Regions:
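Conserved alpha-helix/loop element of class I SAM-dependent methyltransferases that forms part
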Residues: 26-47, 64
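A short glycine-rich, Lys/Arg-flanked "PGG" loop and its adjoining helix->strand segment in the class I
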Residues: 128-143
Length: 180
């Protein structure tokens, strides 16, 4: 598994990038906006929703959800304190920003109606553990919206790095769709 040291390195790396991340995250925006277009509130919803942005980074999409009606509680969880500090600066008030590991979420059972997770799960050592945690915190009938990268994504970049620096890995390995 990914060691705590590796997770700390990932969190620190994203923290360092937090100030410029939103300007450089075109793929994340494209994927997240595609997911948002599919997001619908149920007409029969009998209560306002509790929504979690898992792997929220600087809170770009968390802020978009803040503009929706019918959301009683909005939270963003990220491994990187630096990303969450940027999210707090970006506002608005009223969003709970939580430092947490997606494989061990610091949230109670059956406490969330909707989990939105955009291009985060590929950074996790055990995607199955993340999905089990999502199932644990989702209320019955809750919705999980996840986007990720699969094996074969970024193959051109991987090929270019292989030619430039043979024998060294510069592009993350991604799960196959069967593994998920």
């Amino acid at each position: 598994g990914i060691s705590d040291t590796r997770k700390s390195d990932i969190a620190r790396g994203f923290g360092i990038a937090s100030g410029t991340y939103e300007n450089a995250s075109r793929l994340q925006r494209f994927m997240g906006n595609t997911m948002l277009q599919k997001f619908e509130f149920r007409e029969s919803q009998d209560h306002d929703l509790t929504l979690l942005d898992l792997g929220c980074g600087t809170g770009w999409f968390t802020r978009k959800f803040a503009d929706f009606g019918q959301i009683e509680s909005l939270s963003g969880v990220d491994l990187s304190p630096g990303m969450l500090e940027q999210a707090r600066k970006n506002g608005p008030a009223g969003i709970s920003w939580i430092v947490g590991d997606a494989e061990h979420l610091p949230l109670p059972d059956s406490s969330v109606d909707v989990i939105f997770s955009n291009l985060m799960i590929q950074w996790c050592d055990d995607p199955g553990a993340v999905l089990r945690e999502c199932r644990r915190i989702l209320r019955p009938g809750g919705n999980l919206m996840v986007s990720t990268l699969l094996d074969g994504t970024l193959r051109e970049l991987k090929s270019a790095w292989q030619a430039a620096d043979p024998g060294h890995q510069h592009v993350n390995r991604f799960e196959t769709d069967l593994a998920l």
